[in-house]
């Protein structure tokens, strides 16, 4: 039966250790400045992240003006707009401590309706919009993960060390070719188990099979220049996503992806006009799950062991039987 390596109190202390170390190193190594993040945005701005395109945001109207607002899903688009508004230049970037509510999330051991992540974004030059630059950035972030594991091992040696020396790279098409008989999720399990840490490149577009590896909104990542960081989770014995990130759409890729997604109506939104008219800067960015990070590095079996959220009664009961104590 599962046994947590830490008490609840010890876990809370270790969570702060994880978040403080990672935040400090993320800012230093990517050259990012911390900024305040919004909890909600106006509906008409088009700044909310619509994720896979089907999740419903929480909407409400403001008494003062009657304007319709949405609780953010993430700050994928807001960050790019903020870089423009704040006058950042190529090579400079920002990050935020983002909190969101995703009402349509399917709850399980790794998914909660409460989302907390380091949302970051950095301005790039046109010639940097390459797979090579994407991989270079992934390696930088992976280096922080490696150093975090070493840092925690010094304080809590019983946590062990599991990450390989380097992160592997594979495209979603290569992954499908390698495991044609498996579902996309099963492919992720297989490749993460093989390498321990892997970045899957190119998520959102249709593969040669006619299926997508996974859905991605058409209006922030360039589907050829994005991907997910996956680890093999030693407790869950499954693949475990730590981050989705990518080089963002330029005017050409946004034009193509909106048409593919059947979302040409978004061309009238302020944010989308800013990209199509080359007003907003070219960027790279992503989200790094804070609770996911704590869950992996503290060797937890359920995300509810590292964050406070709401869970169905039947899930709480099932967790109790497995000796999993949710916050």
From Swiss-Prot:
Protein origin, superkingdom: Bacteria
CDD domains, sorted: AsnA
Location relative to the cell: Cytoplasm
Cross-referenced Pfam families: AsnA
A GO molecular function held by the record: transferase activity
Annotated Gene Ontology cellular component terms: cytosol
Gene Ontology BP term (one): L-asparagine biosynthetic process
Keyword Nucleotide-binding assigned: yes
Keywords assigned: Amino-acid biosynthesis, Asparagine biosynthesis, ATP-binding, Cytoplasm, Ligase, Nucleotide-binding
Enzymatic reactions: L-aspartate + NH4(+) + ATP = L-asparagine + AMP + diphosphate + H(+)
Pathway recorded for this protein: Amino-acid biosynthesis; L-asparagine biosynthesis; L-asparagine from L-aspartate (ammonia route): step 1/1
Predominant cellular place of this UniProt entry's protein: cytoplasm
EC number: 6.3.1.1
Keyword Cytoplasm: yes
Family: Belongs to the class-II aminoacyl-tRNA synthetase family. AsnA subfamily.
Protein name from the UniProt record: Aspartate--ammonia ligase
Protein's organism: Bacillus cytotoxicus (strain DSM 22905 / CIP 110041 / 391-98 / NVH 391-98)
């Amino acid at each position: 039966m599962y046994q947590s390596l830490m008490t609840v109190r010890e876990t809370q202390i270790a969570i702060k250790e994880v978040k403080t170390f990672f935040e400090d190193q993320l800012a230093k190594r990517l050259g990012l400045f911390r900024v305040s993040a919004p909890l909600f945005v106006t509906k008409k701005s088009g700044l909310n992240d619509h994720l896979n395109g089907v999740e419903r945001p929480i909407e409400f109207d403001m008494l003062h003006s009657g304007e319709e607002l949405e609780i953010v899903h993430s700050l994928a688009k807001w960050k790019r707009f903020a870089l423009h508004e704040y006058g950042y230049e190529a090579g400079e970037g920002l990050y935020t401590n983002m909190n969101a509510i995703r009402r349509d999330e399917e709850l399980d051991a790794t998914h909660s309706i409460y989302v907390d992540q380091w949302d970051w974004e950095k301005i790039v030059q046109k010639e940097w919009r390459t797979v090579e630059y994407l991989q270079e950035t992934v390696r930088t972030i992976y280096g922080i993960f490696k150093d975090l594991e070493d840092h925690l091992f010094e304080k809590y040696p019983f946590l062990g060390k599991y990450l390989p020396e380097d992160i592997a790279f594979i495209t979603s098409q290569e992954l499908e070719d390698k495991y044609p008989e498996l579902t996309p999720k099963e492919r992720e399990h297989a490749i993460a188990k093989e390498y321990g840490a892997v970045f899957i490149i190119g998520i959102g577009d249709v593969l040669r099979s006619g299926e997508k590896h996974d859905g991605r909104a058409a209006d922030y990542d360039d589907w050829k220049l994005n991907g997910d960081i996956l680890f093999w989770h030693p407790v869950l014995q499954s693949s475990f996503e730590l981050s989705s990130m990518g080089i963002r759409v330029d005017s050409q890729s946004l034009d193509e992806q909106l048409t593919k997604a059947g979302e040409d109506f978004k061309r009238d939104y302020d944010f989308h006009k800013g990209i199509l008219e080359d007003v907003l800067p070219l960027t790279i960015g992503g989200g790094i799950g804070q609770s996911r990070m704590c869950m992996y590095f503290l060797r937890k079996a359920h995300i509810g062991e590292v964050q406070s959220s709401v869970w169905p009664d039947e899930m709480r009961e099932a967790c109790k039987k497995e000796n999993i104590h949710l916050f």
